[in-house]
């Protein structure tokens, strides 16, 4: 086919999958609301890649914006060892296209698959995983970016326990000005089980602490082998958090922006905080101290990423000289674009420009460009976790709660529903 010169067509999950002719598709990895993913091998270098076909890019304006955001952020964070590396991009049929291909690092599975495999994990595993998440998050936050959807399914892991953060489709910018942060939310919200309480309760603004809460939920899941706050809906999610962390103090209660939610919490019986040592009796006391600081109900009391990296629990890994900041902040100016036609043009320009850049660099260096390798040795992965990839928790459109009434609807949309 003339319009596919230099490319080959494979069937992946019964869909046409158009890849660069240098690659051969080797395995179907996963499919979901935003696309399908397969493993492929570069026939020239024998290196593996994951190829993600982002589908229906322009079926909704919010999906086009999500695709543009992901493409831009993956380029901006390219090269950090704890963030998935973008190798290449392609739009095989640029005329009126509705799909984009992303060539990324091939990882063996995600952290959700490892946890759900039931294989025993050690405290050394927990330390390694949390340290790497925080290193990646420090880099992300230093660019004034909030990830907003950290969860085990968005943490990719290799057999040597090398971990990389992926999926930036829900990311937003952060400003020290609360008024600017207040305008950055969308209809799609982070997965309920890992969502910070200040989002549900409509606090005045969001801070980097929302991502720290998610890391705390992940640490608790590692310690317990299952999601820590697994709410059936948003009211149940809030109840589960309060059941463990106890009734907030008056200062925190007064910051709840939703009158209905504030009244609901005030009318609940007083609940004492449950000690994490009773919930995780076999855990390292340092891990429980870090967990307690990450899962502080009030975001202003929550530990920062920088402080967490210096916590005694991570002392074995911590090396300030090997925990870099991003050299430049990320520009979110494109978020103001609302015209789908303009977004289509911007995505085309991003893809074509990046293709030129990586081909120039590859030509100079003689091969595929990868991210940095970990600076410290890793602990081995339990055998049962390998070979599974991108298991999914509830997707944003599955728990939106747009049609929910009363308190459930307010908690589902959080501050977004009040702006």
UniProtKB/Swiss-Prot annotation:
Coiled-coil residues: none
Name of the molecule in the record: Mitogen-activated protein kinase spm1
Keyword Membrane among record annotations: no
GO cellular component: cytoplasm; nucleus
EC number(s) given by UniProt: 2.7.11.24
A GO MF term: MAP kinase activity
Enzyme class, broadest EC rank: transferase
InterPro entries noted in UniProt: Kinase-like_dom_sf, MAP_kinase, MAP_kinase_CS, MAPK_p38-like, Prot_kinase_dom, Protein_kinase_ATP_BS, Ser/Thr_kinase_AS
Reactions that this protein is recorded to catalyse: L-seryl-[protein] + ATP = O-phospho-L-seryl-[protein] + ADP + H(+); L-threonyl-[protein] + ATP = O-phospho-L-threonyl-[protein] + ADP + H(+)
Known function: Mitogen-activated protein kinase, part of the mkh1-mkk1-spm1 MAPK cascade that regulates vegetative growth, conidial formation, colony surface hydrophobicity, osmotic stress, cell wall integrity maintenance, carbon and nitrogen source utilization, chitin distribution, septa formation, and pathogenicity.
Similarity section: Belongs to the protein kinase superfamily. Ser/Thr protein kinase family. MAP kinase subfamily.
A Pfam family the protein falls into: Pkinase
Null allele phenotype: Reduces the radial growth rate by approximately 31% and produces fewer conidia. Inhibits significantly hyphal growth upon high osmotic stresses and in the presence of cell wall stress agents such as Congo red, calcofluor white or SDS. Accumulates chitin at the hyphal tips. Leads also to a looser distribution of spacers. Finally, the size of lesions on apple fruits and branches shows a reduction of approximately 46% and 43%, respectively.
Lineage: superkingdom: Eukaryota
Keywords: Activator, ATP-binding, Conidiation, Kinase, Magnesium, Nucleotide-binding, Serine/threonine-protein kinase, Sporulation, Transferase, Virulence
Gene Ontology terms describing biological process: cell integrity MAPK cascade; negative regulation of glucose mediated signaling pathway; negative regulation of mitotic cytokinesis; positive regulation of calcium ion import across plasma membrane; positive regulation of calcium-mediated signaling; regulation of fungal-type cell wall biogenesis
Active site per database record: 149
Binding site for ATP: 29-37, 52
Cofactor(s) needed by this chain: Mg(2+)
Modified how: Phosphorylated by the MAP kinase kinase mkk1.
């Amino acid at each position: 086919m003339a319009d596919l010169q230099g490319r080959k067509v494979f069937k992946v999950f019964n869909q046409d999958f158009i890849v660069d002719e240098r690659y051969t598709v080797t395995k179907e990895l996963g499919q979901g609301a935003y696309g399908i993913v397969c493993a492929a091998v570069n026939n020239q270098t024998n290196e593996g890649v994951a190829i993600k076909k982002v589908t229906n890019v322009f079926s909704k304006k919010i999906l086009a914006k999500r695709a543009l955001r992901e493409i831009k952020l993956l380029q901006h964070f390219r090269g950090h060892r704890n963030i998935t590396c973008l190798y290449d991009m392609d739009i095989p049929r640029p005329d009126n296209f509705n799909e984009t291909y992303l060539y990324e690092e091939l990882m063996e599975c995600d952290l959700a698959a490892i946890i759900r495999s039931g294989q025993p994990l050690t405290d050394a595993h927990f330390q390694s995983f949390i340290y790497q998440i925080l290193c990646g998050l420090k880099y992300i936050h230093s660019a004034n970016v909030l990830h907003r959807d950290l969860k085990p399914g968005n943490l990719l892991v290799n057999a040597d326990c090398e971990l990389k953060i992926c999926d930036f489709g829900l990311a937003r910018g952060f400003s020290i000005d609360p008024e600017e942060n207040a305008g950055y939310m969308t209809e799609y919200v982070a997965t309920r089980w890992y969502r910070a309480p200040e989002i549900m309760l409509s606090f005045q603004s969001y801070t980097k602490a929302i991502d720290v809460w998610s890391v705390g939920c992940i640490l608790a899941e590692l310690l317990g082998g299952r999601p820590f706050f697994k709410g059936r809906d948003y009211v149940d999610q809030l109840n589960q958090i309060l059941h463990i962390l106890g009734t907030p103090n008056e200062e925190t209660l007064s910051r709840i922006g939703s009158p209905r939610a504030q009244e609901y919490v005030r009318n609940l019986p007083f609940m004492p905080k449950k000690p994490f040592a009773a919930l995780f009796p076999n855990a390292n006391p340092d891990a429980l101290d870090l967990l307690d600081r990450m899962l502080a109900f009030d975001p202003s009391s929550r530990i920062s990423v920088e402080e967490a990296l210096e916590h005694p629990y991570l002392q074995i890994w911590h090396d300030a000289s090997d925990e870099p900041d991003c050299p430049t902040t990320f520009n979110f100016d494109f978020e103001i674009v609302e015209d789908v036609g303009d977004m289509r043009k911007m995505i085309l320009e991003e893809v074509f420009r990046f293709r030129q850049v990586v081909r120039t660099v590859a030509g100079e260096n003689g091969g595929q460009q990868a991210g940095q390798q970990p600076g410290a040795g890793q602990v081995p992965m339990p055998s049962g976790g390998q070979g599974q990839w991108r298991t999914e928790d509830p997707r944003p459109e599955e728990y939106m709660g747009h049609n929910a009434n009363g308190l459930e609807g307010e908690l589902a949309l959080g501050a977004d529903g009040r702006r």
